Regions:
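Solvent-exposed, well-ordered loop and adjacent helix/strand elements within mature globular domains
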Residues: 1-97
Length: 97
């Protein structure tokens, strides 16, 4: 894993599997494998391999209490929680194509 980096590529993220940045654990899931009902998002599309919303936020899964919260990510843009995901509030799941 990698600690506290910014602008990591999607390919590197997939290779590593887990990234720790800004006191958060980032993992990923494919929208094809985990198409939760939380992914019913207006304007959802894929950009550079990441699932994003109409405002270009990377779509995240996290503890249900964090829904719609915005986070800095190590991918050069912010993410927004839409889907229920990990129970630990410091764990954010990034949706990819």
């Amino acid at each position: 894993n990698i600690n506290n980096i910014n602008n990591i590529s999607l390919d590197d993220f997939i290779y590593l599997g887990v990234i720790y940045s800004n006191n958060y654990k980032f993992t990923y899931a494919s929208q094809r494998v985990a198409p939760g009902r939380g992914l019913n998002i207006p304007g959802r599309h894929v950009k550079n391999g990441f699932v994003v919303d109409k405002d270009d936020y990377i779509v995240l899964g996290a503890h249900p209490d964090l829904r719609y919260k915005i986070y800095d990510t190590p991918f050069g843009k912010q993410g927004k929680v839409y889907d229920a995901g990990p129970i630990n509030k410091n764990h954010l799941n990034v949706y990819i194509e």
